[in-house]
Amino acid sequence: MAPMPPAANRPDDATGPAVAVAGTASGLGTRVLAALRADPDLGRVIDLDTVVDPVAARAGLGPDDTLIHLGDPGVELGPDGLPELDPSDLRKGLEASPSVGHLVVLSAAMAYGAWPTNPVPLTEETPLHPDPSFAYAARRAEVERLVGEWRLDRPDVGAAVLRPAVTVAAESVAWLALSPWSARALRASGADRPSQFLHLDDLAAAIDHARIHRLDGAYNVAPDSWLSRDALADLAGPVGRVHLPPSWVARVRDLRGRLGVPGGRAGEAYVEHAWVVANDRLRATGWEPRLRNEEVYVEADPGGPLADMSPRRRQEISLAVAGLGLVGLVVDAVALIRRRARG
């Protein structure tokens, strides 16, 4: 018997349910499509970002089919490494899919908010309470509200909402280095926020798992446990991490953001307060993370030029670099002000 062709190339009358995916341009989208195309039980895999008529494709989804909404078209990533997601685009997509039988939507652990009173870890029973001034987290909470609203008239439709932790992989090296989650990022003295790092492969597997088992409800997606500040510093290798007073850190991040430097602003509270999540509920359905926090971070942060230096020398260089960085930011700010004044 000839092997079954890839799902994306199977004819329209192929047997088995169809799966339509929105937001496939990112590394996550590539992984999800690969998993779907490897499933011989699927009839069709529809890439809504590239199909000629996505509205018609959505309208053709039936009770046995699944819609997976990963994010917006394009490769722009949010501050947690997930694809950006516009709630208005999701609303339009849901309205165009009136008969679909199952939905998988990507939210984020950031939707819980980062508060001094957060339990460690956060579970799905914790209400979503993002800081409304941090637009990214507020959008994720709005996404979940839209899914709940859409389901009111569809009690028989299952909807899995996944809330991943910070998500990275080997291709995330540059992104992580510029993010506030790197061990090399500025930290306020005394801050000891725990960290979680989920691998893109494990998130893609969780999405496919939710599709296969037609999960319903909210599920955190994260590795087992989390990393303390000291554990993260150890994993990053011999790096010189500078600790500054909280007011200095806030000013530097604010200035970086105003100058358009990546990673300048990621929601101040998320950098200072705990928002790690428990994965027990998803694990109970049969999903397991393949990689631990430690393995994920090391893959995405292979180390830098300080790796072979002594701790004392690393600290001396780090302090010097931090000072130069502050001076450089001030110089950039002055130059920016002068350019605007001349304009």
Where in the sequence are the language-model features?
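Active-site Tyr-X1-5-Lys
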Residues: D131-A160
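N-terminal Rossmann NAD(P)H-binding glycine-rich loop of SDR-like oxidoreductase domains
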Residues: G16-A38
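NAD(P)-dependent short-chain dehydrogenase/reductase
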Residues: W150-Q196
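NAD(P)H-binding glycine-rich loop region in Rossmannoid oxidoreductase-like domains
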Residues: V51-A96, A114
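Conserved C-terminal active-site "lid" loop/helix of NAD(P)H-dependent oxidoreductases
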Residues: L259-P289
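Conserved Rossmann-fold NAD(P)-dependent oxidoreductase catalytic core, especially the SDR/UDP-sugar
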Residues: R91-A135
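Mid/C-terminal beta-alpha module of Rossmann-like enzyme folds, strongest
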Residues: A206-A266, D301, A307-Q315, I337-R342
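Amphipathic terminal alpha-helices
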Residues: P3, R292-G343
